[in-house]
Curated annotation (Swiss-Prot):
Keywords: DNA-binding, Repressor, Transcription, Transcription regulation. Coiled coil: none annotated. Residues 18-37 bind DNA. GO terms for molecular function: DNA binding; DNA-binding transcription factor activity. The gene is hdfR. It comes from Escherichia fergusonii (strain ATCC 35469 / DSM 13698 / CCUG 18766 / IAM 14443 / JCM 21226 / LMG 7866 / NBRC 102419 / NCTC 12128 / CDC 0568-73). Belongs to the LysR transcriptional regulatory family. This is HTH-type transcriptional regulator HdfR. GO terms for biological process: negative regulation of DNA-templated transcription. The keyword GTP-binding does not apply. InterPro entries: LTTR, LysR_subst-bd, Tscrpt_reg_HTH_HdfR, Tscrpt_reg_HTH_LysR, WH-like_DNA-bd_sf, WH_DNA-bd_sf. NCBIfam families: PRK03601.1 (NF002946). It comes from the Bacteria.
């Protein structure tokens, strides 16, 4: 039996709501409904009664509940034990492509230079969208997440690492926003709220990407502009701030599970500055 089906069953039984269960599992509501139907088909019984917003366990669902809890608990314990034996020297760090390119790449180098304390530690640099990385963190498939947004779940611990400055850059001097095409570099969902006020409300990006390197290479060819970290852009060279634009300060957070067995290691690693310029 697919353990994901049992996991979904337990979440729906806990929340009594398909929408809230979907949100907790980082799935769509239709995916949750499909999983429940799959489980019901495998067992040959209905597990829930559905009357609008009133979702209840059937008698069969009530009988399945303790077995599902035991199976999932055993499975999680097995996964943790196996992972501990195979990954005791591995440490995975997740972030978006733009964060790796603009600041975390340098930090990773500093971690290797300071390996005296943790000799033999093997790092994995994982690139993905924030939502995917949060899910991996929740499922203990990721040790540490670096992101521009504070955690929204109580089970996570976090540390504010500092702030970095974004400015609107183009490839030629003395350019105005109205003369340029906008390239959207993704800096997190909450950044889009600020972005709307800093770029014209009717401005449609001709390119959207999560890679700062790609965006930087395209602005000259597309007569464009994009938001880049000031410290990174200065090192790159050949970039100029748009005349009628402003700057924006962004926070950077480290996030990990509160009950992580690598809590002490994480604290040690974060003593090494993540940002070149911390303020």
């Amino acid at each position: 039996m697919d353990t994901e089906l049992l996991k979904t069953f337990l979440e729906v039984s806990r929340t009594r709501h398909f929408g809230r269960a979907a949100e907790s599992l980082y799935l769509t509501q239709s995916a949750v409904s499909f999983r429940i139907r799959q489980l019901e088909n495998q067992l040959g019984v209905n597990l829930f009664t559905r009357h609008r917003n009133n979702i209840r366990l059937t008698a069969a669902g009530e009988k399945l509940l303790p077995y599902a809890e035991t199976l999932m608990s055993t499975w999680q314990a097995a996964r943790k034990e196996v992972a501990h034996t195979s990954r005791h020297n591995e440490f995975s760090i997740g972030a978006s492509a733009s964060l790796w390119e603009c600041m975390l790449n340098q930090w990773l180098g500093r971690l290797y230079q300071n390996q005296d304390t943790h000799t033999g530690l093997q790092f994995e640099a994982r690139i993905a969208q924030r939502q995917s990385l949060v899910k991996q963190l929740h499922e203990r498939q990721l040790d540490l997440l670096i992101t521009t947004e504070a955690p929204k779940m109580d089970e996570f611990s976090s540390q504010l690492l500092g702030y970095f400055t974004l400015a609107l850059y183009t490839s030629a001097p003395s350019k105005l926003k109205g003369d340029l095409n906008y390239l959207r570099l993704e800096w997190g969902p909450d950044f889009q709220q600020h972005e709307a006020g800093l770029i014209g409300t009717d401005e449609v990006p001709i390119l959207t990407t999560s890679s700062a390197e790609l965006a930087q290479q395209q602005i000259a060819m597309l007569n464009g502009c994009t938001w880049l970290p000031v410290s990174w852009a200065r090192k790159k060279g050949g970039l100029h701030t748009v005349v009628d634009s402003t700057t924006l300060s962004r926070p950077l957070y480290a996030i990990w599970l509160q009950n992580s067995d690598k809590h002490a290691l994480i604290r040690d690693l974060l003593k090494i500055n993540v940002l070149d310029e911390v303020y």
